Amino acid sequence: MYLLIPAAGVGKRMGCDRNKLLLEVRSQPIIAWTLLAAQAASEISWIGIISQPTDWPDFKSILANLQLTKPVEFILGGSTRQESVYNGLQALPTAAEQVLIHDGARCLATPNLLNSCAQAIRHCSGLIAAVPVKDTIKVVDEDGIIQNTPDRRNLWAAQTPQGFNVELLKQCHAEGVRQGWEVTDDAALFEKCGIEVQIVEGEETNLKVTTPQDLAIAEFILNSRDNS
């Protein structure tokens, strides 16, 4: 299975002016933990890191330390996640029929989750890892006034990996460019094009490291795995 890792973001909410994936959790950069999970996932055979060239020297140094056995390629990132993934799709080997897309900042996803998504995408056109929402969600207007309360039983929190048929996803991205759609994940492009996206049960610990608090939580989770 082919894996694309969007890794081009700057950690503004992290309070830093460089790529947040270079910040460390337990003496390893965030991106290193993501790559180690991909290395350990038996279904993953190829990894594409979508990032800015200014980060490539640091990423290459990390790769040298990790000594991964799977092929890794660097792909030029865009100005948005959507544009970055589009670039990643164009860089896939021609043999790629399905692809997984996994946020570099979701460094706690386990090899088992990557494998489950890789196996499931062979039997559908699109999928996302997701978990049921536990909190009650309120829809509010621009003045902060509650408008309605959706039924929590129908709400799932989207995660990554997200998996897709490569040709269909390329078509959806092309349509998104034509229509001027701006989306925050690839499943939304499938939805806008009327293509079904299935759910694969995600992991409660599969958080996206975005804030300093997330760094502390990630360290706690990694420590707990060592002690289990």
Swiss-Prot record:
Query: Keywords assigned by UniProt?
Result: Isoprene biosynthesis, Nucleotidyltransferase, Transferase
Instruction: List GO BP terms, alphabetically.
Output: isopentenyl diphosphate biosynthetic process, methylerythritol 4-phosphate pathway
Record carries keyword Protease:
no
Pathway assignment: Isoprenoid biosynthesis; isopentenyl diphosphate biosynthesis via DXP pathway; isopentenyl diphosphate from 1-deoxy-D-xylulose 5-phosphate: step 2/6
**Chemical reaction(s) catalysed:** 2-C-methyl-D-erythritol 4-phosphate + CTP + H(+) = 4-CDP-2-C-methyl-D-erythritol + diphosphate
Q: Does the keyword Cell division apply?
A: no
List the Gene Ontology MF annotations in alphabetical order. Answer: 2-C-methyl-D-erythritol 4-phosphate cytidylyltransferase activity
**Enzyme Commission number, as recorded:** 2.7.7.60
Q: Do you know which PANTHER family this protein is assigned to? A: 2-C-METHYL-D-ERYTHRITOL 4-PHOSPHATE CYTIDYLYLTRANSFERASE, CHLOROPLASTIC
Please give the family membership noted in the entry.
Answer: Belongs to the IspD/TarI cytidylyltransferase family. IspD subfamily.
The protein here is known as 2-C-methyl-D-erythritol 4-phosphate cytidylyltransferase
| Species per Swiss-Prot/TrEMBL record | Nostoc sp. (strain PCC 7120 / SAG 25.82 / UTEX 2576)
